[in-house]
Amino acid sequence: MKRNLFLSAILPFSLAVALCACGSTPGESTPSEKTQSSVSQAQTDSAATGNEISIGNNFSIEAGTVLSDGSIYFVGREGADGFCAYVSTDDGDSWTKEELPWADQTVVGIKLRPDGFMLGMRGQQVVYAARGEDLKTADISALGAIDGISAVYPIDGDTFTVTGGRTETFVNEDGQEQETIHPLPFEDMVLQYDGSLVTQWGEGIAADQAGYYASDEEKLYYVDFETNECRSLDGAGQIDSYGVLATIKGSSFCRNGIFYYVDDQGIVAYDTTNNSESRILTDTLAPFLQDDVSCVTLIVTDHQAIAVAADLNSETQTVYRYEI
């Protein structure tokens, strides 16, 4: 498929969660009073070691966010029980399970907004659910006749963007039949949930050259692969460009206009309000940066950075928590 869908679908893995403390000496605890309105100079280089804990019973994370009240919110599958959520109000020290009305549904490409709103795909449907509510189907009739949807991303509280087109079957180099979706007849549309078409923003170009999408509930931020610039898309289809980023190795996350991403040295915070960049974690030996491991989910709170790492060989997940 043409689009980089790094975050569109996460394969289920068993989960172990590692809590890692960094940026302080053993025995020290340095409270933070930072907010995410700007990148603080106190977010300095750091290294990490720590222990592992478990969340739930065979819980596999599909998506995560920081809720408006600062709580950590993960949605995923728990064994044969289907989808559920786990919430932490104490930066990951303890977790509370939250049942989801759509637990038994087949939903892929899950994305979360800071209010707990979920957007995803079910077959050729775009589905969504407010926190604690059942699934609803978005009206995508404005797209006309379609054969396939490859990705959906929330922009703000009223709009989302969707990519897809015609499905074609071909034989790959191993002699196996494989399907791909061409960027026709639509590509990168901004839609309202009632089916109104706002604009077509990608025009078949951004699909080749953009990825690492993350919404802060006001705009959808992403990386332009051609220039490696951070850009944003609003609900009216307006695109803004910011500065050039380092090479992204893992997942991304956005909160209050700050675009966080994983590179080959750790975690970087790019503040789009003033085009400044600060490294909040430096640790080239971090487990989520190693070969055969991929950082599939990244979230950043006022005090913690949490990276969900997937081991591509053993099909396990480990979550690493760092003080920042």
Whereabouts are the PLM-identified features?
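Short coil/turn segments that connect the beta-strands within blades of beta-propeller domains
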Residues: D69-G70, D115-G116, G157-D158, E217-E218, ...
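N-terminal, intrinsically disordered, polar/charged segments of Gram-positive cell-envelope systems
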Residues: P26-A63
